[in-house]
Amino acid sequence: MKDVILIANAGSSSLKISIFGIQNKKVKDKIYNIFLEKNNNKILFYINQKQESAISIKDNAIEMMINLFEEWWTKQSALNLIATGHRIVHGGKNFNKPVIVNEKIIKELRVLIPLSPLHQPYNLQVLDLFFQKYKDISHIICFDTSFHYTNPPITKAFGLPKQYYDKGIMRYGFHGLSYQYVSSHFKEITMEDLPTKTIIAHLGSGSSLCAIKNGLSLTSSMGFSVLDGVMMATRTGNLDPGVVLYLINHEKMTMKEITELLYKKSGLLGISGESSDMRTLITNNSHDSKFAVELFVYRIVLEIGKLIAALEGIDCIIFTAGIGQNSAVIREMISGKLSWLGIKIDYGKNQKNEHRISTKGSKVKVFVVPTNEELIIAEEVMKFL
């Protein structure tokens, strides 16, 4: 039998599972890429991008996804599951590194649900189901916030009374697993050392940027929640708190309506009125679509300026995630607005998504490095085995 580990990443309507083979206590290869999603009234089940089945939703969707996976898993007699790894969005103040799951930790993480209400419940539901079904193996949690634990206090504090900071109302930062992968695998991918003062731009449906100094997170664009920072596919990004007060007092909106507005109806979708997909907006000639793209780029450029100030300089910018690693147009637009830094992009290399897309004469190096959150979780799991 072949020893494998399972990596789970759960969303509100989907579940991604990666099965990695291991050899000599190292992650060897990805054997299966499994994706389950809720689509209308059905759950669709994909293995290595091929649809295997579709079943009607009769009960809790996440539980049905796990059961559907387990039904398939029982037929994989050649594979021996020795551990699972799980992405948990929020680790709060106390979880600054991966941990082995037990009942006490699950209870502690449930307390953090108010800090990440749209992600944490589903992360924990999947974790708990695997923990209950596979009692004889280790289950390891990796947190999206842990990478930013090195941020100094000055970067974490809001201008609120200290009592709120003590209660955990502070800047945390997210997408940490992506930043950890890109920074730790940078040399093997690019054949260059990670420059001292680096900004990584994780640009996807959820987007953020991180200032990294000497390989460690210094600060990032996201703060208390995944709403903060740059504008995203359906999220607002930075927003004057007075806007929320106005929506409550004058628009008479409920908390549920405001949550829906800020998380699901804003960003690229809200500005364009057409789509949350950057690929669609780039090819659309409407005024609102163009404005949405321009605003997305503008907010990113402003954030890069803030992070350069925090770093007290800049040596390198790295683009990653769905938009960052695939959209030559967005990279060119951002780099163009940063030309005052002495950034020069090689048009041909940028179009081909090559790893280094800046010219030799560019004063700031610019790279494209695909992220791999599942692999970094798998590598963390192996440290416990």
Swiss-Prot record:
Pathway: Metabolic intermediate biosynthesis; acetyl-CoA biosynthesis; acetyl-CoA from acetate: step 1/2. Mg(2+). Can also accept Mn(2+). One of its GO terms (cellular component) is cytoplasm. The keyword Amino-acid biosynthesis does not apply. It is found in: Cytoplasm. Mg(2+) binds at residues 9, 373. The record marks 175, 235 as: Transition state stabilizer. GO terms for biological process: acetate metabolic process; acetyl-CoA biosynthetic process. Its cofactor is Mg(2+); Mn(2+). The active site is at 144 (proton donor/acceptor). Keywords: ATP-binding, Cytoplasm, Kinase, Magnesium, Metal-binding, Nucleotide-binding, Transferase. One of its GO terms (molecular function) is ATP binding. Disulfide bonds: none annotated. Its EC number is 2.7.2.1. Pfam families: Acetate_kinase. ATP binds at residues 16, 202-206, 277-279. Belongs to the acetokinase family. Catalyzes the formation of acetyl phosphate from acetate and ATP. Can also catalyze the reverse reaction. PANTHER family: ACETATE KINASE, ACETATE KINASE-RELATED. This is Acetate kinase.
